[in-house]
Amino acid sequence: MTGVGSAVRRLYLSVYNWAVFFGWAQVLYYAVTTLLESGHEAVYAAVERPLQFAQTAAFLEILHGLVGLVRSPVSATLPQIGSRLFLTWGILWSFPETHSHILVTSLVISWSITEIIRYSFFGMKETFGFAPSWLLWLRYSTFMVLYPTGISSEVGLIYIALPYMKATEKYCLRMPNKWNFSFDFSYASILSLAVYVPGSPHMFTYMLAQRKKALAKAKAA
C-alpha cells in the first residue's frame, strides 16, 4: 500500500473505531444509569438505538477483513459478529417480550465493556501508532469474564424468545408457496443454540491463544 493509501486507511480506521467506541460508551452509560434509576426492565428501551448503531456498524469489520484493511481473519470475525447481529435484530428487536428480562442488562453491559476496550485499543493504535500497556492487558484479559457472561446471556435470550417465535410464527415461511420451500425461524434459532456448544469453547480457546501471543510480544518489546 502506498504512503497516501496507508494514510487514508489509517484515517478511515481511526474514524471508524472512535465512532463505534462512542456508540458503545453511550450504550454502557444508558444501561448503567437506567439500571440504577429505573431497574433492569427499562434498560433495553434506553439503549436500543445506540445498541443497534454500534452493533450493526460491526458488520463493516467483516468487509475490512475481506478487502485486507485489517489482518483479523474473517473466519474468527464472522461468527462473533453474526451471532451478535442475530441477537440484536433477530431476537431483541423482533421479540419485545424479551426486553424486560435481566439477561438483557447482563448482555448489553458485557458487550459494551468488551467493545469500549476493544475499539479504544484499535483507535489508539490507528490514531497514535500504539496503545498503552494497561489497555493492551485489558484488551486481552477481560474477555475471560465478559465472554462467558455475554455468551450465557445470548443463549438465555434466544431460549426465552423461542415460545414467542412459535406463537407468532414470525419470519416463518409455510408450504405451499411459489418457491416450494419452508422455513421455521424457531428451528433455525434452536440450530443456532446447538452451534454455541462447539463454537463457544472454540472461540474462547482462540482468544486465550491470542492473549498469550499478544502479551508475550508486549513483554519482549
Swiss-Prot record:
Transmembrane segments: 12-32, 52-70, 77-95, 101-121, 142-165, 185-209
Record membrane topology: Multi-pass membrane protein
Signal peptide, first to last residue: none
Major subcellular site: endoplasmic reticulum
Residue ranges, Lumenal side: 33-51, 96-100, 166-184
One GO CC annotation: endoplasmic reticulum membrane
Pathway: Lipid metabolism; fatty acid biosynthesis
InterPro entries: Tyr_Pase-like_PTPLA
Main EC class the enzyme belongs to: lyase
E.C. no: 4.2.1.134
Residue numbers annotated as active site: 147, 154
Compartments, as annotated in UniProt: Endoplasmic reticulum membrane
Keywords attached to this entry: Developmental protein, Endoplasmic reticulum, Fatty acid biosynthesis, Fatty acid metabolism, Lipid biosynthesis, Lipid metabolism, Lyase, Membrane, Transmembrane, Transmembrane helix
GO BP terms, alphabetized: fatty acid elongation; sphingolipid biosynthetic process; very long-chain fatty acid biosynthetic process
Pfam annotation, one family: PTPLA
GO terms of molecular function: 3-hydroxyacyl-CoA dehydratase activity; very-long-chain (3R)-3-hydroxyacyl-CoA dehydratase activity
Superkingdom per UniProt: Eukaryota
Topological region Cytoplasmic: 1-11, 71-76, 122-141, 210-221
Catalysis: reaction(s): a very-long-chain (3R)-3-hydroxyacyl-CoA = a very-long-chain (2E)-enoyl-CoA + H2O
Family that this chain belongs to: Belongs to the very long-chain fatty acids dehydratase HACD family.
UniProt function note: Catalyzes the third of the four reactions of the long-chain fatty acids elongation cycle. This endoplasmic reticulum-bound enzymatic process, allows the addition of two carbons to the chain of long- and very long-chain fatty acids/VLCFAs per cycle. This enzyme catalyzes the dehydration of the 3-hydroxyacyl-CoA intermediate into trans-2,3-enoyl-CoA, within each cycle of fatty acid elongation. Thereby, it participates in the production of VLCFAs of different chain lengths that are involved in multiple biological processes as precursors of membrane lipids and lipid mediators.
Protein name: Very-long-chain (3R)-3-hydroxyacyl-CoA dehydratase PASTICCINO 2B
Gene expressing this chain: PAS2B
